[in-house]
Amino acid sequence: KLTSIQSITDFMNCAGRTLPDNISLWARRNLAVARSHEVSPEERRHAQRALSMMMNIQWKSNYFEAIDPVEARRILDEELYGMERVKQRIIETIIQINRTHTLPAYGLLLIGPAGTGKSQIAYAVARILKLPWTTLDMSSINDPEQLTGSSRIYANAKPGIIMDAFSMAGESNLVFIINELDKAASGKGNGNPADVLLTLLDNLGFTDNYIECMIPTVGVYPIATANDKDQISAPLMSRFAVIEIPDYTPEEKKIIFSRYALPKVLKRIGMKEKECILTPEGLDAVISCHENTSGIRDLEQAAEHIAANALYQIEVNHVSSVTFDAEMVR
């Protein structure tokens, strides 16, 4: 990681033309400030911090290699049960990337009840694209400055969350997961956080108030999640291809619990499937206990509870396996 002035200088000398022109010019100017004795120590510190952040990001081209649709489908089937329409839309996006070798003009907006796997879809897409991903939770953003950073004229100035996301990803091409987009217009500070998102989504570049350099965003693929589309402004909605995700049916929940949720928990805690057996009546009871809840989050917690109980009985009561019927589940 480049932190010292000398390491940053050496890197810039080696990087040459590999840096975008505007970033190279910006870096030389800030390096001059960081070395200068004619500015305040605070200005030098800010310049060095900004340089360290920018030079530790790999500034990649917006050319994307072809992606195997068959492998993409395998990943989707591995990560998600059902959701055929969602998978079809993602595969269509992959094929479009293969034709143009660039990201689509629009990101994805996934709208559905809580717990229906919206975040899981976003992670699967990042895995398919072989890109780092970062998350932005709009429910915790009260002021646009949290996103854009603060000017270096202030002693406690710092970069914004968006710039931090690029820094943590370590490259300019990434999947930007924006959770709870329907909360974006509810800022309590000065201005509207949604307006900042528009500049990020337009693919025309983004400028952080602390960094003071326009960074390319053509390699950013935004995927947003929301529960209520009526709370999303028309300008924001127009930047996305919208996919509505319905809640799971009871039969789908049965399959998800028995084939995905419970085996996943058992594997994680080192148990074999034959050590924790769920009868058909027990499975019906699990689904019945959670019939009034949307999504599968509560089912995943039920799987945790059943697996933990089975492990307890095996270790404490020294039984070889535990069978859960309807009475035990309830």
Q: What name fits each language-model region?
A:
Residues K1-A34, P41-E42:
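Charged, amphipathic alpha-helical segments characteristic of ABC-type P-loop ATPases involved
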Residues G16-L25, S61-N62, G170, D228-S238, ...:
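Conserved C-terminal "switch" segment of AAA+ ATPases
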Residues L25-Y63, I67-I111, I162:
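Pre-Walker A (pre-P-loop) alpha-helix and adjacent loop at the N terminus of AAA/AAA+ ATPase modules
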Residues L103-Y106, L129, T148, A169-L174, ...:
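Short loop/turn elements that form and flank the Walker-type P-loop nucleotide-binding site
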Residues P104-M138, S167, A234:
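Walker A/P-loop
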Residues I128-K158, A165, E252:
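AAA+/P-loop NTPase substrate/partner-engagement loops
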Residues A169-I177, D208-A226, K274-L278, T323-E327:
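AAA+/SF3 P-loop NTPase mechanochemical coupling elements
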Residues I178-P216:
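Conserved catalytic/switch belt of AAA+ P-loop NTPases
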